[in-house]
């Protein structure tokens, strides 16, 4: 960073003088709020002219620690009991040995500065002159070195003064030395006044020095002149050094005046004003430097994150013999960390437990739906149960790892509520979990958002035993086929679809054994949905009446509504349906969530495979259900597994006019044919056929959205437009919809 400051100041050495006699103007340093007067700008050039550092290095950290220890003990009240309250430094011999090597190279410079300040302050030189003299003496040191050496010279003077004060009453040697140096130890009022007046200033001196040292340690590779905002604000470091050294001189001058005038010395109003002014000045400088540090660290983190991101992309584009390099890069690379928690034993384990296994990374934020976790756990637990060998152990060909994402991670670190929420989610999980969101570094989150399209909603990335990405999101395959989709590749997905037809088996498979057991050749089954309880009552009672009169076996099941914001309303409707015995209805809301999620997953799966054409029965059927659900009530009728009809809310009218219209056609046409003909030929002719209208929720799960899509009713191209909706029920941070 030193090279940056030098290059910045090299452009300023042309210099200019304030010859106008006008009041100095103020220049605002961007992004900091720190104003620099034109006088300070000229002073900056004078300071820079004294700055010609050589190759020597000062171990400023060690020296600063020693200086801070002296000042911390010396700036207490003069009562020696206070000094004894500070903890003694540990490893004293080791510290003394290392400090001796540091001081060997700089002790002469410290003594020289101490003598220069003491002499010139007693001879009446003004503070600015003495400060510039210190800069001349320390011209060969870097900015942090100048400041720490000057502070060490001050600690030498100030520490000796207070050491004599603290031991005056206990040690005859201290008493004699105090008398020889004219320290007014018996004038407690004077000493306490000096201490109170200087403590605030010394505290600010230490704070500014610590910031300057920290800024000087920033790596040059990231803080470069091509970042103008950073280079501009860093160029104010010499001014910070100037005012801190000037404050040192003010403190030493006051101590020297006390020892020179002895018991007659009292702080003047001017002395108090000067220390107060300097303390305020340094506080403003410290605030500016602290903000500068924050900006620099943010810039460095961004640069390092960018570098790490490139490395991570390169790693995924490289062939590996196993998956360990990939998993280590994703879940904290430090070898001493045990980054996983075993869901069964609740013990921390190393990543080695995943070596050469297919790994399913369940990536989500902390707002993952309990319904989603519940269904996923059922699928996971059942698959483990089915794969238990004769040895009693599970032989699953894959492992699941939950990867919790909190972005920004600072929210997690300062929020006990989020930490408790994470633990409540992790602890019941039977699979592996990353032990803390803090183990997922920022560039990894950026990688997941960019490469895997993670958008807070859960995704399931599959890493094969060699570390390759088998699937960027296999969650829709899990919802449709469960673990039968293993190894979750595109070819496996295509193979499974070749075996499927649009049937009731596909729609309800894995959800409810009751409905699945209804699927017999002579059974008629109505699945229906909506949130209008009056419509539901009319439809179910009319449908059951038609079935009874037609002497057919009809079963009915209520499946709720796709929009999860209606969750509580749907729960109450479901309770009424069961209490009034209107039809079968799921008591567990998670099953309704699963039903609609499976339909969406089928739609997205077809789209990703490029099968979103208008001749695909699965696509057409799902589009109808999703579209009719958006309009209100709807129903799907099947005979056995065969789906024979999908209708919107007008199906209730078709049922209610049974006696007056299509009843007479049932003996000749059959129950479904008579109903369907009347519905399409009579009811829809009056009510009209509703064209398609449904939403794609833009998340990583949905993947790409088709450029065009035809209406399933009129076959004309559908209009596409974008909308944004806030979904508090799903606790999403971001949600976009594409409406067709």
UniProtKB/Swiss-Prot annotation:
It comes from the Eukaryota. Expressed in phloem sieve elements. Residues 1-23 have a biased composition (Polar residues). One of its GO terms (molecular function) is protein homodimerization activity. Signal peptide: none annotated. Residues 1-27 are annotated as: Disordered. GO terms for biological process: phloem development. Disruption phenotype: No visible phenotype under normal growth conditions. Can form homodimer. Scaffold protein required to form the phloem filament matrix in sieve elements. This is Protein SIEVE ELEMENT OCCLUSION B. It comes from Arabidopsis thaliana (Mouse-ear cress).
